Amino acid sequence: MALLVDRVRGHWRIAAGLLFNLLVSICIVFLNKWIYVYHGFPNMSLTLVHFVVTWLGLYICQKLDIFAPKSLPPSRLLLLALSFCGFVVFTNLSLQNNTIGTYQLAKAMTTPVIIAIQTFCYQKTFSTRIQLTLIPITLGVILNSYYDVKFNFLGMVFAALGVLVTSLYQVWVGAKQHELQVNSMQLLYYQAPMSSAMLLVAVPFFEPVFGEGGIFGPWSVSALLMVLLSGVIAFMVNLSIYWIIGNTSPVTYNMFGHFKFCITLFGGYVLFKDPLSINQALGILCTLFGILAYTHFKLSEQEGSRSKLAQRP
């Protein structure tokens, strides 16, 4: 009986963790979009706030023994910290200049780009069926972008740069974790302050600092509270991702990501009244089919690899 109670509690904890991640992941997209649309807060400055709050949050976490920091040489993290800046800044610029549907769908292109990088730069091979799933993903993104009545060329440039830098960042994070033998929180603990320092230097060259529209400009209390809330939620997203992967698996997190993908798209059309044509809807379904097929084939191949290892004498 006690064992059954423990199992039920465990399932409830995981369900609560997944629900929390769902809420904060969707909330951060809509909140950032709201800040851009209704307050006009500068992009790089918002990213800087996110990085600083994330580092402060991680500092509190390590003081509470949630994780143990590991000493890392800063010189080996410079490129990673720079790509971290790039991926968050360009992703936020994509959100600022595109509809939520186009922003969310463009992010799906990260999978094909990661596969291309690993194939050409790291000589990693992928099965034919995995490669074929890239066709519906890419076709769906093209369909949605082509028929988007709010199509924005600058927004698509930012989306493309965001996908490229995000893909590089994700590949490098995996490589650095393996190379330095650290987990994601230990890596982020060093990365966040380095990225904050880089943005602190860059912000004055691209955005006003003290004048109208600057980070220290005459903002309303509501705008400042929303920016601070955005930073706290961004940290919660990172923390909940780490908790979910640690208590379930990366596969569970990715499968749950498909549900968040659909909810975020739907919320964008409801909250911000983004128009949706039939062809765009077909593009979304096409991309979603490709993502689900990719996940299914990837799972099958991982299970096959485990079975072969288990059968070895």
Swiss-Prot record:
Q: Which GO terms describe its cellular component?
A: Golgi apparatus; membrane
Q: What is its main location?
A: membrane
Q: How does it sit in the membrane?
A: Multi-pass membrane protein
Q: Which UniProt keywords apply?
A: Membrane, Transmembrane, Transmembrane helix
Highest taxon, organism lineage: Eukaryota
Quote the InterPro entries the UniProt record gives.
Answer: Sugar_P_trans_dom, TPT_transporter
**Pfam family example for this protein?**
TPT
The record's subcellular locations are: Membrane
Q: Which GO terms describe its biological process?
A: transmembrane transport
Q: Which residues cross the membrane?
A: 17-37, 40-60, 77-97, 126-143, 153-173, 187-206, 225-245, 252-272, 275-295
Alphabetical list of SUPFAM superfamilies matching this protein: Multidrug resistance efflux transporter EmrE (SSF103481)
Q: Which GO terms describe its molecular function?
A: antiporter activity; nucleotide-sugar transmembrane transporter activity
* Family according to the record: Belongs to the TPT transporter family. SLC35E subfamily.
PANTHER family hit by this protein: SOLUTE CARRIER FAMILY 35
What does the record give as the function of this protein? Putative transporter.
Query: What is the name of this protein?
Result: Solute carrier family 35 member E3
Per the UniProt record, the source organism is Homo sapiens
Q: What is the lineage of its organism?
A: Eukaryota, Metazoa, Chordata, Craniata, Vertebrata
The gene is: SLC35E3
